[in-house]
Amino acid sequence: TLAYCPFIERLPEALLEVNPSLFVAVPRVYEKIYGQAIQKSKGFPKRAIFNWAISVGERHKPEILAGKTPTSTAWKLANKLVFSKVRAGMGGQVETFISGGAPLGRELAEWYANIGIRIHEGYGLTETSPVIAVNTPINHRIGTVGRTLPNIDVRIAEDGEILVRGPSVFKGYWNRPEETKAALENGWFKTGDIGNIDADGYLSVTDRKKDLIKTSGGKFIAPQPIENALKLSPYIGVAAILGDRRKFPAVMISPNFVTLEEWARANNIAFTSRAELVANPKVQSLYDGVVEEINRNLARFEKLKRVMLVEDEFTIANGALTPTMKLRRRIIEGRYKKQIDDLYAQAEAATAP
């Protein structure tokens, strides 16, 4: 039996109703489930127990990634108190978890492994019918989309683009010869994705080629890994890295207003609208702190110098996200062009002699 949930908001109840054995979703769904688990663990002693359980999972991660079930007393207790409850929220009977549609953040995959869940990330496009590579129960490596399928050839172009060749690759676009010519070169399909292949043949996908940010200093930044790390914060709904042809990168954040409003009430911050809330200096300081933590793990040219909070949620309905929950970057940047220009102008003025 196959079941499809068209609305992400209804996913929790759909999982309980269907009780699937195999679960396929885009990374945004796994982010949502992670965020709900973090929210439910708030307060003492819940958070202390939760953090302890995660530390137990971290120690047993090699076994989990090898497809084994840990047998230590600590693992059994952590599983009973925490991990089993997270899995119960996903139906309780899922044996196989698959992610596709966009790169899955490494930190997120690591967290799921800590609670006993291996997410098998795969990669493919419509033009490749569709799967190119996938992690399997036997060959599995976090941070990659696995090894390529039989009879599929993959190589990395000089500019980092993933090229694919094989019998499953399409012949061309119907009645669109110019687009076909641009997409195919000597039998190789240009995926439009940036990636690499490690020494063991595992393929990693970094970002969309068109989404790479080139600063005015000539440095290239892949936004998705940074955005994925930011979205692990319970206070962030969606993050969009800015900085193309600018002097430095910045980030536009659409908050998770459920958790932000709870935090504001707990900290006695009065507000009558979301616009007033995101303009509050204490709220800005909260997000500055989140970004500062992320910056510690970034190269100097990648560090985010400014944080821009918006009062709007980024959704499929308002055109900010695709049906697979990817950012529509050009639409978002166009919609907030004035605010973005003002952000950089203020930064220029602040650093002027």
Predicted segments with their positions:
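Conserved C-terminal helical docking segment of ANL/AMP-forming enzymes
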Residues: 220, 234-238, 259-309
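Conserved ANL (AMP-binding/adenylate-forming) active-site segment centered on the GW(Y/F)…HTG consensus within
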Residues: 73, 142, 169-192, 227, ...
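Conserved adenylate-forming
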Residues: 3-159, 163, 167, 184, ...
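C-terminal boundary motif of the adenylate-forming
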Residues: 194, 199, 233-259
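Conserved C-terminal "lid"/linker of ANL adenylate-forming enzymes
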Residues: 213, 238-240, 247, 288-353
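Conserved ATP-binding/catalytic segment of the ANL
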Residues: 148-215
